[in-house]
Regions:
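Active-site HxH/HxHxD metal-binding segment of metal-dependent hydrolases
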Residues: 12, 23, 33-109, 128, ...
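A contiguous binding-surface segment within folded domains or other stable secondary-structure elements
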Residues: 105, 114-164
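Small/polar loops that bind or transfer phosphate-bearing groups
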Residues: 6, 27-31, 55, 102, ...
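Active-site metal-binding loops of divalent metal-dependent hydrolases
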Residues: 31, 58, 82-83, 113-114, ...
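Hydrophobic residues in well-ordered beta-strands that form the structural core
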Residues: 29, 77-79, 131-132, 173
Length: 250
């Protein structure tokens, strides 16, 4: 398997490239609109062709690059089936592996940050990798105060889906704001300042309800745009509309 971790600075978003060397099938997890050209240039340099985009959830802090990537490459757009988005080609759900050539990706239903959020687990005889989306971050976790989020659901998701994994499972989050790249389940279980070190549900709810964070500055257009797989809504700022893409079907 070929693997790359890519970073978009403005929203501090990580995009992940996975490619099956045997079949040539290539996947981008959580691509960002502003970095589509960079991602395609990388694939070209590596001699790869994009076949799939896979979303963890409907993002509020950036516009996805999914639609633009499909327009250019004819790749398939996949994401949680519960989102019920007509613009997606494939709906994924827990219990039904997503197959990329010889790579098996196991979706994990992990609501809490958003109500339909999914993480993706790669496990083989060598190592386990968890693409945790916005549910579990490095020494943190996703917020729960919009998009039908719930601290109770997030606590349950992290404890019942993530913290049962082997301690050496490598965690690759969708965001990091301090220049870190990955963590492990063991570290987050013991050291995560919001949910680690045996914090109780009551303690976690108190922490999450006291965060008092401002809403993401792109939220008003990112959420409706991402419900269209990255098509710019009417209220997108002029400087962003220049990089938006219309689907082939209009």
């Amino acid at each position: 398997m070929l693997f790359k971790q890519l970073f978009e600075l403005e929203s501090s978003t990580y995009t992940y490239m996975l490619a099956c060397e045997e079949s040539g099938k290539t996947l981008l997890i959580d691509p960002v609109l502003e970095t589509v050209d960079r991602d395609l240039q990388l694939l070209q340099e590596m001699g790869l062709k994009l076949t799939h985009v896979l979303e963890t959830h409907i993002h509020a802090d950036h516009l996805t690059g999914a639609l633009k990537l499909r327009t250019i490459t004819d790749c398939k757009i996949a994401g949680p089936a519960l989102d019920n988005l007509p613009c997606r080609d494939i709906g994924v759900q827990e219990g039904e592996p997503f197959i990329l050539g010889s790579i098996q990706i196991n979706p994990l239903f992990t609501p809490g940050h958003t109500d339909h959020h999914h993480a993706y687990l790669l496990a083989n005889n060598i190592e386990s990798r968890l693409f945790s989306g916005d549910a579990l971050l490095i020494d943190s976790c996703g917020r729960t105060d919009f998009q039908h989020g719930s601290p109770e659901d997030l606590y349950k998701s992290i404890h019942e889906k993530f913290f049962i994994l082997p301690d050496d499972t490598i965690v690759f989050p969708c965001h990091d704001y301090a220049g870190k790249f990955s963590t492990t389940i063991g570290l987050e279980k013991s050291e995560n300042s919001r949910i680690g070190n045996n914090r109780t549900l009551r303690e976690f709810i108190s922490i999450m309800n006291s965060l008092d964070l401002p809403f993401p500055k792109k939220m008003d257009y990112a959420v409706p745009g991402n419900e269209l797989c990255g098509k710019c809504p009417d209220n997108v700022p002029d400087e962003k509309s220049k990089i938006c893409s219309e689907d082939k079907q209009g």
